[in-house]
Amino acid sequence: MRNLGLIGGMGPGATVFYYQELARAGAGELLLIHADMDYVLTAVAAANHIALAGYFARLIERLARGGATVAAISAVTPHACIRELEKITPLPLVNIIDATAAEIRARGYRRVALFGTRFVVASRMFGMLDGIEVIVPDQVDAIHEAYMQTVGGGTEGRQTLARIAHELPVDAVVLAGTDLSLVFDETNTDFPHVDCTRVHLRALLEAMR
């Protein structure tokens, strides 16, 4: 079994969720490194993808020295630099965007909307969902604010997102923020959706075999 090196800390709740789910599934050895969230968000906001990719590559190098043989980032927004990172990473990457795109296609969804940070929603997941129609809702700011409320543990944000989901003319909503897995699951979600975190976790477990 391959050893996973996970870059976490963006945010911490989602990182803990990744750890819990991987442990519950009986994953092999896991190495975790905590990224500087302020630096990452500043770089994403400035579209400084080359510098951000270099930062992540250095973190992955440290994970590799610790014994990791495959790597991943436990957050969606930092994947803004994933194409640049793929060119310089010292370890194979399992990236959440490609895993999510494959899941959307497998389910036959043609038109989707995204829930997540403003960066992710407005950029249509950084334009990387090839061949999939991604609409940008008029409520981008409301989605961002509701998402941040869910990160803070509030229930109002979840209710707002559920209401917006029912109003959107799409086949499904992509939960494109890892913290959303902390508030949405199959028991409380009554709209068609793709949970990118759970999709990513399945891809990670497959890559570790």
Regions found by a protein language model. Name each.
Residues 1-209:
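Non-catalytic structural scaffold of enzyme domains
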